[in-house]
Design a protein with these regions (language model features):
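An anion-engaging/catalytic patch
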Residues: 1-134
Length: 135
């Protein structure tokens, strides 16, 4: 993402938040800590929301803190939605970069779908409840 290397695990799609923050701190001369993010009440509420909506079992969380010393697996690994929220917390201008990246990726995939996009939407809407599409 931009000038930052983002690491994602294949087994669960979690992202390494510690690695991203380390890169940010080195580039900007900052001293932010992942635990600062976890200390926010809004973070706790968001974690609860992810757990509720993604049907996490008790004792299973949308993040994992690893102390592994080998293989680059150390750090805090986060569910993709939690990672996006974390990345936006780092800095307001970085928040813009994160949102722009997500938006651009959405448009890119829509453009890749091209002429098939309306057909795809129709097919998806035929298998989902009608009230899902009402605002």
């Amino acid at each position: 993402m931009g000038e930052f290397k983002v690491i994602q695990r294949t087994k669960d799609a979690f992202f390494n938040a510690t690695n991203l923050l380390k890169q940010w701190n080195q580039l900007k001369g900052m001293k932010k800590e992942v635990n600062d993010y976890f200390g926010l009440s809004s973070t706790k509420e968001f974690i609860y929301t992810i757990m509720e909506r993604e049907n996490y079992d008790r004792g299973n969380y949308p993040y994992h803190k690893s102390r592994a010393n080998k293989g680059g697996n150390a750090g805090t690994w986060m569910h993709p939605l939690l990672f996006i929220d974390f990345a936006m917390w780092i800095n307001p201008s970085f928040k813009y970069d994160v949102l722009k990246f997500v938006y651009d990726e959405m448009i890119k995939f829509r453009n890749l779908a091209g002429d098939a996009y309306p057909s795809m939407c129709k097919a998806v809407s035929s298998i989902l409840p009608d009230d899902l599409f009402k605002q």
